Amino acid sequence: MISLKCKNCGGEMSVDGSGNLYCDYCGTKSAFRDDELIQYKNFRLQVLNYLRGVHDKKADGTSHEELLWANAETVSFATKDGNDITVRYLYSHEEEGVTTYLARNSILCVFPAQEIDRAAIWLSGLELLSFPPADVKNLQECFPKFLGRYDLEDGRVLLSFERPDNVFPLSMFGSLAPEHAAWIMSRLENICCVLEYSQIQHGGIHADSVFINPFTHHAILFGDWETTRSRFNYSLHDTRKNLRQLRELALHVMGMHVGEAPKEFLAFLKSEPAENAYQDFERWDRVIEDGFGGRRFAKMDLDFE
């Protein structure tokens, strides 16, 4: 596990498409120190080797997974009822005081003691979700599955969610080729249709709030549910904000590969969203046909060394 902090404000640093560090909070940019670069490359290589081994089915998946988790860190929490929760985690990310831990079978979100109401707001955002009676695409799997809440001894609150197999934060994968950004875009267009059906503005669609499985092309809008706006003050302007954010995300994840994208894809990403998510999805379908030659499963290249 690695955690790179901004020397200016203490926020979590991200890695851009050119391999430099930047801070989402204060905008500071910097380069890796030699020791940080070695640590980052080793960690990333371990993750990608594990994913490659699973994908190619040429290696013992169990041993690959054990190798991956051999370098995991451990964090412990004392609960108010006198129990201890100890978790091994591969990755952590802090955003606006909320720390997310990627464990083997779960994803944990820890809210600060002085802001525990944010945990309740987070869950309230999820409770606003509703799905069509005939959910033929099983879209419920594109959203977090809540497992439990734990009140901690120090006043913090821990929320636990299910982590499906081989699901990782999108930010972990760096710059992606256009065909991979496109399948992520397809999943997010589906997700935005659910948000509109539920009359929700999410407000936080970005590389750390979206988790993906690169083998099944599955995506989950996991994070930032406390930023949702409910059906009581919902308008079509709100759904267009969701659609603008997914366009910004697609451009971000392509990074240095953006110049390789079909012109139809780039034109769509730079265009204003349609009046609603359903019309926007229809427009996106035309981009898939005209820009990529139709829908097909593209094996994700995991060689990001």
Task: Label each PLM-derived region with a short phrase.
Residues 192-214:
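Catalytic-loop of the protein kinase fold
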Residues 141-182:
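Conserved structural core of kinase catalytic domains
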Residues 213-305:
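C-lobe/activation-segment region of protein kinase-like
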Residues 73-139:
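ATP-binding glycine-rich loop module of kinase domains
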Residues 26-37:
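Short Cys/His-rich micro-motifs in 6-15 aa windows
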Residues 5-8, 25:
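Short, cysteine/histidine-rich loop/knuckle motifs that typically chelate Zn2+
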Residues 179-191:
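Conserved alphaE helix
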Residues 39-89:
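Juxta-kinase regulatory segment immediately upstream of eukaryotic protein kinase catalytic domains
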